[in-house]
């Protein structure tokens, strides 16, 4: 069964392991989530729990939102996400999910929205090679061939310049270095997608390599 929690990316720092190794970590603030709904195979065709994170002013919510959260005896939430294949039987609607669902050393997947880079060329966006910069070359950072003459068109999927970033990205198999239950913090080894203060979803790894 998968387990998960919603949180906000705070930033990066570094901690020392017991053997003196310096470990770069990302700090994720995961205040208690509330189970808003349980979905089962019988009712919805799949198993999942719906989590709510961060309170939202009632003035900013509509009646369906208020009614949905009232069933869980809680206030309207700013972020609502589903954790698929979760332990539906072990959780009840209205129950809080805290950082202690994870333990130090566990392997997790972290999902977030990558930083937006704006309109970028093919070298930055797709990692293509540039042309010669001197010796009479007039080809430097352009996208290159658009394809053969015969179809007389550019095929769909051709890698060209365009807006970069702002996509949902999941980084898999990150290790939890520390769980701070007092301050509701998770310290995850390495970097996670997204800007500071952005929403991230931490879930148990689907492809554990240990």
UniProtKB/Swiss-Prot annotation:
GO terms for biological process: translation. The keyword GTP-binding does not apply. It holds the Pfam family Ribosomal_L3. Signal peptide: none annotated. Belongs to the universal ribosomal protein uL3 family. Part of the 50S ribosomal subunit. Forms a cluster with proteins L14 and L19. This is Large ribosomal subunit protein uL3. It comes from Bacillus cereus (strain ATCC 14579 / DSM 31 / CCUG 7414 / JCM 2152 / NBRC 15305 / NCIMB 9373 / NCTC 2599 / NRRL B-3711).
